[in-house]
């Protein structure tokens, strides 16, 4: 709902849309401490991380979002989404190190391309949000 409210505000919505988007983004930043679970957390981090980053990017110039809260949000998104996404892109849960093939047909680096793509999109989106060329590249 943060993205929908942010987009609605950006294309001519009301202050209520903007306030709702910021409230939702900051509620997540103040509550969520990480993405957990099995290896599927990498897929979740990639998908949801870029969605949060895009919503925040739309709200970047909203006067109702304080610089302090915007900075806090960026720190949160790096910790919760950027770090696991870049780790997946670098290590792929160490499946590249696994040289043996299983009877299930798994190969080293066996994750489907959508896993890498959504994590690359997450990393790039957060790099843009944080104005960080190193992250983006």
Residue ranges, per PLM feature:
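Aromatic-lined, polymer-binding surfaces characteristic
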Residues: 1-137
